[in-house]
Structure formats: C-alpha cells, structure tokens
C-alpha cells in the first residue's frame, strides 16, 4: 500500500480541522472563541480557507459549523475576503449545484471588500486583480447552468430546492455590481469585456423555453448600472451664498483701461488671450465679451472728454491718445484675433455688436462728438473683412440713420469714409502712415519727420506718433536711436558746435516729452532699447532723466549702519562726481565749493554760566511777545534763524508772517533791517548725539540711490553765480566757438543755477521785487533761447525740489516770464519749439503754482456715497491708505475702473506696496456683507492684478495664503475671517489667482522664442523690467509659488485634524474643480496631485466625493488610478459613499 506524503502546512490545517470538529461535537464553548489560526504557527490561511469551504459545502447540504466559522474568521480578519473569493473560484467540484451554493459566500464577501493597507499603493493593484475574475466566474457559472435546461430541472428536483440553481450566482453578481465600491472598481477593468459577459447571461436567459422574466429583468438592470458606473462622473460645484450673484461681472470692462492706458505696449494677441482667459474663468459668453470690450472702450473715451468733480484736467494725467489708439487700432485687432483663433464665432460677435449698438447708443453719441468721427461705423469698416458685408451693412445702416436724426451728430454721419481734417482720428491715421516708414527701413526719414514735430510745435501729432510707437512695440527701438544721436551731439566731433547744440536740444526735448507724458515707460529700457544695459546709460540724458523726471521711487536710498559706512559712501559719491565732471570737461574745485556752502562760523566767546541754550532776542520778536493779542502758539513759531552766510533769511512759515503783518505797523517793518545788521547772533548749542546713533555732519546730506548709480556732473557755486549773472544780462554762459565743448557741461550747471534762483526767492519771499525778478527770468530765457532744453531741465529740477514757499514763488516767476517771453518772441527761430516745451511742462507748472485738489475732511463712506470723487495723486506720490480707500469707493460705485483711479494702484505697485491696496480692498469686500457687492468686488480685484500681473499675482497670493491658509489661521476665529459668506468670496479670489498664475506660467514657457533654462536658480527676487533674464526668473517664481502652495496644503492636511483651514482647502479644491473648463483649469488640475484628495477623504470622508477625485485623476496615469482606488476604500471604511 502506497503511503501519501503530507507536507507540514497541510498537517497543521488538518490538525486545525480536527480540533474544530472536536470542539463542535463536544459543544462545550463557542467555536469562534476557542480556535483561531493565530494559535497554529505556520498555518496557511489560504489552504485553511479552501478546506473550510470544502467541508462547509460537501455534498447536498451545507455544514453550518464550518460555514459560520469561516465567516467569523473573515469578520475578525483572520482570513481575508479575497482569500474566500479565490477559494470559491478555484475550488474544484463535480457538482455544479454545490458550486452555485458557494456563490453565497461571494455575496457575503461584498461587504468586506477593502484594501489591505493604505500605506502602499501596490495593494490597490491586488484589489483590482480579483474584481474581473470574480464577475467572469459568476457570469460563466450562470451560463453553464442555463446551457442545459433539462439538467437544470433535474437539479431542482434532485435537491428539492424551491428556487432555480442559477439564483445564487445571480444574486452574488447583483450584489457585486450594485455595491458602490465593487461597481466602481469594475470600471477600472476592461469595462467592455464585463459588459459582454453580462450580455451573454442575458442572451442565455432569453433562450430558455420557460423564460424567467424577473431574472432577465435583473440582468438587464445590471447591464445598465454597469454602463452607467463606467461613465465619467461630472463634478458640479455651486458655491452657497454667492451663486445667485454671478451674473454681472466687471472684469472685462476693467481690463480695457488697463490695456489701453497702462499696458498699451502689449501685443493684440496677448490682450485677446488675456480677455478670453478671463471670460473662460468667469464663464462669460461670447456676445457678453464683445459687449463689455466695447463698453469699456467707450467709457474710457467719454471720461477723458469731461471734467471730473474736484479733478480738473490740468491736475490729471492725459489719456486722450491712449483711448483713441486703443479704440481705432487695438480694438479691431483684438476682435479679429478672437474670431480667427476660433475663440469666438462670427455669430457671437454679431450679437455682441447688435447689443452694444442698442444699449450703448448714447455713449457712442457722446464719443462721436468728442472724436468728431462716426466711431462705430469706423470700427465696422475695420471688422468687415472678418465679419462680411452681410453682417456689417445692416449695423452700419442702423447707426448712420440714427446719426442723421440728431443735429449734433449729422456732420459726422459720413466721417467713416471722409475724415474731417485735424481731428484726432485724422492725426492718428497720419501717425500710422509715418510710423510705417520704420517697417520699410526708412529710419532716417521717420527720424526727420519726428523731430520736425518738435521744431514746429505739433504736440498732438507728436503724441499720436508716440502712442502708435508704444502700441506697435517700437518705442524702445526709436528711443535708443535718438539717445545715440543725443550722445553723438553731446561729445565733441567734427560737426560744428551750433549744429551739435541744435541736434542735442531737439533730441533731448523729444526724448523728455516721451518720458514725461508716458510715466509707465521704463527709462532704462527706453534708453537701452530693451532689457539689459548699454553704454547709453553713461549719457547725460539718462542720468538727468533718472534723477529729475518725476516718478514714483523704485529704489530705496542706501541706509548706512554706522558712521564708518556713511563716510565710505560719501567718499564713493565724491569720487563718482569727479569722474562725471572729468567726463564732460568740468574742472571746478568742488572741495572748496563745499567749504563755501557751509562755512565754519566761530562760536563767540560769551562769558556766561553753563547753560544748554543761548539766544539773543530779536527786536521784532520782542514786539510780538509783548503784544497780548498774539497767541502762545504764534510765539513758539517765531525763532531767530542762523544764516551761515551772514545774509538775511526770512522765515518760510506762513502763519507768523500773517501775524506780524497784522500786528506791526508799516513803519516798523522797515526798521528791523538796520537793527539786525548790528546784532551778533550766537551759535545755538545743540545736544550731543547719543553714542549708539550714527554721527552725521550737518553739512552732509543723506546719500541717495541716484548719487551712487547715476551720478551727475556738478559745477561749483562760485561758477554758478558767475553764470547766473551773465544770463541775467541775456548772454549764454557757454562758448559757441569752442570745438571741444561737451554739452553735458552746460546741462550740469542747471541744478546749481536753480538752487541760486531758489535762494534768491527764499531771501525775498515776502517783499520780492516781482518786476525785477520777472525781468531777470525773461533775460535768462533769452540767454537760453538757442537751447530751450535747458528751460525744460530747469523745470524738471524745480519739480523735484522739496515743496517750499521759495519753490512756489520761483514757479510763479517762471510762469509769468515764460508768457512774457512767448508774447515778444513770436517771430523767433525757436518759437514753435518753445510752444512745444510749454505744452510739455504745463502740467508741471500748474502743479508747482496751484495747490493740489483737496478733498473735504469727511469719512470715506460718507464722502464717497454722497458724490463720486476721484482722488488726485502726484506724479511721484505713493498714495496713502486714505486715497486708496477713496479710489476703491470711486471704482466700486461705478463697477468700473477709471484710469485715473487705476493710476493710484500703478503708483502703489511701482513703490512695491502691493500688500497695502490688496489688504484694504479685500477687507472692504468681505466686510460689505452683500453677496452681489462681494462677488463683483472680488472680480474687480482680480482684474486689478493685470496692472502688474506677475508681481501682483504672487504678492496677493502670498497675502491670501498667510491670512487664511496658514497653520495657525484656524486659531483666529474671533475676527470673522472664516465667516461662511466671506470665506466663499475669498475662495473665489484664491481660485482666480491660482488659475491666472498657471495660465501666465504656461504663456511664459511657450511664448517665442523657445524657453531654454540657463540659470541654476534656487532663490531669486522679483526681477525688474530691464532685467534680460526676467523671463526665466518669473518662470522660477511662479513655479515656486504654485509648488509651495501644494506643499502647504499637504503639510496642513497631514496633521489629520479637521479645522477651518482644512475646510477652506476642501472648498478651494472644489472651487477649482467646479470652474469652467479652460486651459488654465486643465493646467492647474494636473498640478494638484490626487493624493491630496485622498488625504482629505481620510480626515473627513463626507467632505469630498468620487466625482471630485475624478477631476484630479488622469485616467492614463497608473499612480492616479491606484490613488483613486485607495480613495474609494477610504470612503468604504467610513461608509460615506457619495458617487
């Protein structure tokens, strides 16, 4: 007899079964509490499962002891659910009825389907590997049972079963497909093959002689459910609280003044793509996009043609040519690009034009009167090649008939074909023709025409050409060309001095007007012809413009830490000054000049006791002090002022002057001069500085950034006095017969001359001989008649001086003298050039002479609610919070951004104060408490980012993350930052910022020329526009911003605690997933890993659902599929399915 060899694992299993049988026979205790596989070291749980199933389903009956024990082992996880299914599928038996009975175990195992561990994604593959074989096994078993209908009936008779044998596998199959987790897992397998197997089962049922309608219906339902579960689930996000207000959106309208007035150098393609991206993010329809573009463009023109309340035209920037150029040149190109790139259809554009023609009729009327042109008809002429005559003719007819019914518009009804001469449109078209010379290589011809505009005083034509150059992106090229001409004329050459002076003067005036009238143009890029540096930065024009073209300061002055560093900086500045003087041929002794400016005064020997302060009263002061009508405050303001030069110096405070005039008789006013001449004024003893503070000599001013980076040459004060005396006689101070004359030395005299003129007006402010001062200034103008650019420089220098009474007085003198000079010099050679200069500096003169517009002292809310005021901002002013609030209310009430209000934001951006205005506007938004206002306000803030898109996007994103998504933000709940309605609006802004950041990054990566990473960047600051590597640096910064955001999300979520911050992250992810399908969303979704959704499901399963996970998973990415399976299992673990 042959012996059977049994391996050790089988022996252990047999031992386990024997013990189980014995315990069952003795019935002493519950079997489940007595026997467990863990008590049998080395046992194979899969082999144990196989044997338990054989004993449980052996023959024609079911052994409940073994069956129940098996199920209990599954419950306490001694045996896994997939081992049971594996045993059922692979256990061999010659009785098909027994196999059908075993299917009830599969049905039971459906509730236990779960991943083995969440620590390893590979366990997800194990889960998938058993799904498809199980369905195939059940489907095949049903087909085998139904294959022989006679045998089916015999089985039912033999075993005395009331139900058909196929019901057990069919119920198991139904449980498998109806279970949310199992049916979702089946979708990851070959769905078509599973569908095919189910269809075969249905066909088998249909072939029965005695059809089973209930079974057939059940199979059909299973097919439908499986197909439905295999379809991708769409995520729908409805932000509670603000969804009803997502109707009126000002974003596109606000983009128009930004592109027209502040980013007019951008290409039409970029403008169109940005507008389309905003439209996609905001879920705008095509006709609404066209309507809002036209609305914004026509609003811009209407505002430019009127005076704003408390904001006259002489105190505000002129956007006349920017608005005109945008409407007539850029706007048709933008619409054409949207059509040709298939962003919009012709039908959508037609519908938008019809809506604009109906709703904006009155605004077009006002614009046509201002432009003296049929603006809408001219626009249709430009769009006719892409729209076709069948669309444009009916619109043209409607507009023309309307214009003919209005007497005011009748003269302009046919101006789309026959322009009126000398109108803005006529000048603009002429400018376009002249700029075309550059395209044909006729650079010299264009230069001659452009300079002629300066010589003939054609300011409008000049500004029109400048606007076209900026629009077409050729201003930098032209600027560098004229700077090179200016440099060539500045230095000595074979050309005569007078001719060099004329060329230098013409080009200097031309370049200066461009920079003055276009403050958004970078001086560095304008001079260098684009990003990077060149020798042009060594020119006098560059150095002068960097110091005296009044703009918001970009660079902070160096702050020395101690006296040693301060002295080193002063020495460096002195060395740079000597080099600059040597370059232009100035040989003045500046060291003696310093001593001349600040002479040492010996302290008189006064025999008194030790006191902190010594002073001798002024007789005028005594008269005022003894007068009982004078207040204590007035007495405190009267001081004896020490004049180091021994010259009389008047107090510049207005109040004491007024008091003295009213209290002292006229006869007394003449006496102090004789009295003061005989009074010795002692030095006032000053308290010694503290040891820990840096010691600075009083005569040494602070070192500025401009002194270090763009030093100007300088003449001595003694030489300046001689020059000024010569000019007061009407004689130029430079030699026109010196062939080696460097014109830069002439320019270098202006600051000293200006300072002397200011000093003269300071000394005689209250009793200046106005007639004599005007005559002297008029003579000075005659002296520089051949070089009017010096007058421009004098005004620029005075404009940058600190505000004082002397500065204002000198401005009055210059203004009156200029009018007088122009009145008597109408036949002069350079008369028209002087007219051109007067137009250039008129705003400077107005601001120097007149006071800035003042606002009533009331609260922002009451002030702005009562009337719509646009705040004033100086050309170099960094607006404070009060003005920014006024600008916000001004824009908020109109749901549109005036370029004059946007100018405040531009200044704040230039001063790197992004956080200031963004914090104010976000705070005002979330405190409004009205869904309509909050939604519209957030969309306005989003549009403001385009003023300085790259900087603003990063800075406002950092602010939002720091306030709402920092690790400790959840502890700050008392301040209301997580108020339900407010947080919805903040999430909306966060979503918009992330979307536009991703789109901007993609644009930078894919624009021409092809991006090549050259720098190994690890940390970098925001680059300036002049930086040649700015593209690569911005790409690095945007990438870092997005990566840091995702990392912060993971860091917060991995703590495993549900908080307000985690809830905000959940809502943000839902908002991104629910945004409109566009390129920005697709790029951002790819960046967010599905692991983040899985982590959130692990913390709070009810907060996320399967449709959200589908958004962030790529079906072709295996790791994403594994994560999705883990996500489903996490939902099963908490029984929180939401499919």
Swiss-Prot record:
GO biological processes: cell fate specification; defense response to Gram-positive bacterium; nematode larval development; vulval development
Tissue-level expression: Expressed in seam cells and all six vulva precursor cells (VPC). After VPC division, expression is restricted to descendants of the VPC cell lineages P5.p, P6.p and P7.p (at protein level).
GO CC field: cytoplasm; nucleus
Keyword check for Cytoplasm: yes
Subcellular location: Nucleus; Cytoplasm
Main location: nucleus
Motif (Nuclear localization signal): 695-701
Protein name: Protein lin-25
Top-level taxon: Eukaryota
Annotated function: Participates in the inductive signaling pathway downstream of let-60 Ras and the RAF/MAP kinase cascade to regulate specification and differentiation of many cell types. Positively regulates the fate of vulval precursor cells. Required for induction of the P12 and excretory duct cell fates. In males, it is also required for proper formation of spicules. Does not function in the signaling pathway that promotes exit from pachytene. Plays a role in responses to M.nematophilum-mediated bacterial infection by promoting tail swelling and preventing constipation.
Keywords: Cytoplasm, Developmental protein, Differentiation, Nucleus
Provenance organism: Caenorhabditis elegans
Keyword set includes Ubl conjugation: no
């Amino acid at each position: 007899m042959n012996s059977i060899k049994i391996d050790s694992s089988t022996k252990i299993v047999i031992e386990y079964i024997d013990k189980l049988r014995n315990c069952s026979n003795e019935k002493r205790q519950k079997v489940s509490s007595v026997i467990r596989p863990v008590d049998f070291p080395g046992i194979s749980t899969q082999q144990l499962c196989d044997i338990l199933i054989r004993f449980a389903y052996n023959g024609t009956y079911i052994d409940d002891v073994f069956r129940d024990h098996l199920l209990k082992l599954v419950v306490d996880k001694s045996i896994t659910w997939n081992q049971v299914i594996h045993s059922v599928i692979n256990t061999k038996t010659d009785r098909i009825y027994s196999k059908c009975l075993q299917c009830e175990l599969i049905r039971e195992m459906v509730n236990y389907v779960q991943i083995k561990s969440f620590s390893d994604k590979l366990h997800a593959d194990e889960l998938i590997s058993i799904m498809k074989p199980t369905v195939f096994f059940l489907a095949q078993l049903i087909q085998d049972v139904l294959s022989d209908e006679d045998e089916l009936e015999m089985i039912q008779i033999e075993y005395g079963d009331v139900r058909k044998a196929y019901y057990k596998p069919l119920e198991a199959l139904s449980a498998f497909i109806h279970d949310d987790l199992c049916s979702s897992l089946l979708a990851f397998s070959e769905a078509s093959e599973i569908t095919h197997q189910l269809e075969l089962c249905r066909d088998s049922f249909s072939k029965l002689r005695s059809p089973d309608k209930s079974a057939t219906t059940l199979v059909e339902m299973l097919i439908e459910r499986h197909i439905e579960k295999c379809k991708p689930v769409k995520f729908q996000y409805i932000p509670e609280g603000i969804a009803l207000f997502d109707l009126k959106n000002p974003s596109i309208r606000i983009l128009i003044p930004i592109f027209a007035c502040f980013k007019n150098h951008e290409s039409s393609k970029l403008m169109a793509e940005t507008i389309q991206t905003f439209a996609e993010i905001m879920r705008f329809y095509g006709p609404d996009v066209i309507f809002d573009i036209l609305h914004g463009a026509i609003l811009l023109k209407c505002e430019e043609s009127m005076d704003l309340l408390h904001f006259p035209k002489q105190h505000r920037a002129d956007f006349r040519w920017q608005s005109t150029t945008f409407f007539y040149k850029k706007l048709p190109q933008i619409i054409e690009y949207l059509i040709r790139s298939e962003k919009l259809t012709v039908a959508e554009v037609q519908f938008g034009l019809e809506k604009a023609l109906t709703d904006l009729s009155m605004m077009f009327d006002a614009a046509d009167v201002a432009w003296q042109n049929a603006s809408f008809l001219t626009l249709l002429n430009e769009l006719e090649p892409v729209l076709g005559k069948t669309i444009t003719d009916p619109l043209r007819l409607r507009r023309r008939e309307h214009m003919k019914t209005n007497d005011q518009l009748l003269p302009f009804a046919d101006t789309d074909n026959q322009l009126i001469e000398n109108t803005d449109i006529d000048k603009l078209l002429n400018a376009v023709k002249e700029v075309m010379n550059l395209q044909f290589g006729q650079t010299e011809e264009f230069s001659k025409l452009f300079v002629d505009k300066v010589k003939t005083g054609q300011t409008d034509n000049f500004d029109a050409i400048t606007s076209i150059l900026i629009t077409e992106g050729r201003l930098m090229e032209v600027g560098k060309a004229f700077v090179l001409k200016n440099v060539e004329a500045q230095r000595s050459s074979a050309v005569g001095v007078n001719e060099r002076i004329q060329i230098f003067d013409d080009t200097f005036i031309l370049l200066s007007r461009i920079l003055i009238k276009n403050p958004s143009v970078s001086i560095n890029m304008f001079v260098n012809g684009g990003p990077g540096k060149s020798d042009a930065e060594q020119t006098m024009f560059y150095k002068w413009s960097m110091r005296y073209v009044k703009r918001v300061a970009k660079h902070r002055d160096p702050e020395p830490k101690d006296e040693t560093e301060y002295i080193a900086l002063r020495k460096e500045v002195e060395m740079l000054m000597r080099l600059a003087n040597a370059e232009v041929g100035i040989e003045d002794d500046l060291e003696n000049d310093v001593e001349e400016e600040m002479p040492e005064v010996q302290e008189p020997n006064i025999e008194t006791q030790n006191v902190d302060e010594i002073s001798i009263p002024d007789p005028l002061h005594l008269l005022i002090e003894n007068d009982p009508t004078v207040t204590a405050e007035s007495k405190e303001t009267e001081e004896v002022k020490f004049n180091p030069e021994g010259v009389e110096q008047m107090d510049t405070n207005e109040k004491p002057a007024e008091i003295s005039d009213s209290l002292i008789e006229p006869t007394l006013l003449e006496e102090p001069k004789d009295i003061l001449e005989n009074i010795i004024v002692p030095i006032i003893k000053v308290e010694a500085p503290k040891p820990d503070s840096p010691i600075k000599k009083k005569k040494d001013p602070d070192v500025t950034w401009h002194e270090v980076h763009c030093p100007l040459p300088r003449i001595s004060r003694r030489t300046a006095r001689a020059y000024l005396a010569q000019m007061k006689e009407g004689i130029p101070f430079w030699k026109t017969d010196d062939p080696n004359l460097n014109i830069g030395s002439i320019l270098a005299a202006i600051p000293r001359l200006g300072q002397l003129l200011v000093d003269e007006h300071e000394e005689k402010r209250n009793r200046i001989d106005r007639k004599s001062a005007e005559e002297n200034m008029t003579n000075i103008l005659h002296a520089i008649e051949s070089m009017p650019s010096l007058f421009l420089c004098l005004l620029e220098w005075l404009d940058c001086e600190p505000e004082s009474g002397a500065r204002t007085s000198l401005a009055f003198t210059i203004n009156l003298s200029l009018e007088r000079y122009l009145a008597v010099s109408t036949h002069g050679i350079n008369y028209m050039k002087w007219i051109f200069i007067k137009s250039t500096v008129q705003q400077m003169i107005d601001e120097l002479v007149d006071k800035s517009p003042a606002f009533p002292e009331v609260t922002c809310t009451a002030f702005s609610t009562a009337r719509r005021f646009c705040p004033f901002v100086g050309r170099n002013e960094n607006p404070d919070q009060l003005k920014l609030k006024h600008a916000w209310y001004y824009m908020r009430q109109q749901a549109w951004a005036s370029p004059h209000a946007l100018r405040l934001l531009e200044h704040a951006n230039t001063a790197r104060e992004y956080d200031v205005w963004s914090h104010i506007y976000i705070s005002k938004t979330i405190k409004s408490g009205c869904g309509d206002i909050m939604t519209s306000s957030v969309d306005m803030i989003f549009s403001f980012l385009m003023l300085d898109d790259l900087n603003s996007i990063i800075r406002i994103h950092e602010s939002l993350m720091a306030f709402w998504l920092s690790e400790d933000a959840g502890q700050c709940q008392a301040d209301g930052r997580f108020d339900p309605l407010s947080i919805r609006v903040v999430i909306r802004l966060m979503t918009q910022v992330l979307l536009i950041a991703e789109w901007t990054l993609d644009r930078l990566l894919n624009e021409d020329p092809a991006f090549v990473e050259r720098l190994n960047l690890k940390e970098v600051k925001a680059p300036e526009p002049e930086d040649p590597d700015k593209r690569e640096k911005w790409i690095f910064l945007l990438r870092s911003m997005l990566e840091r955001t995702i990392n912060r999300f993971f860091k917060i979520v991995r703590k495993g605690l549900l908080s307000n911050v985690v809830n905000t992250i959940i809502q943000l992810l839902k908002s991104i997933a629910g945004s409109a399908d566009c390129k920005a969303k697709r790029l951002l979704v790819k960046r967010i890993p599905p692991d983040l959704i899985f982590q959130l499901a692990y913390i709070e399963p009810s907060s996320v659902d399967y449709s959200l996970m589908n958004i962030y998973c790529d079906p072709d990415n295996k790791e994403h599929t594994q994560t999705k399976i883990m996500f489903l299992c996490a939902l099963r673990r908490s029984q929180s399915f939401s499919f």
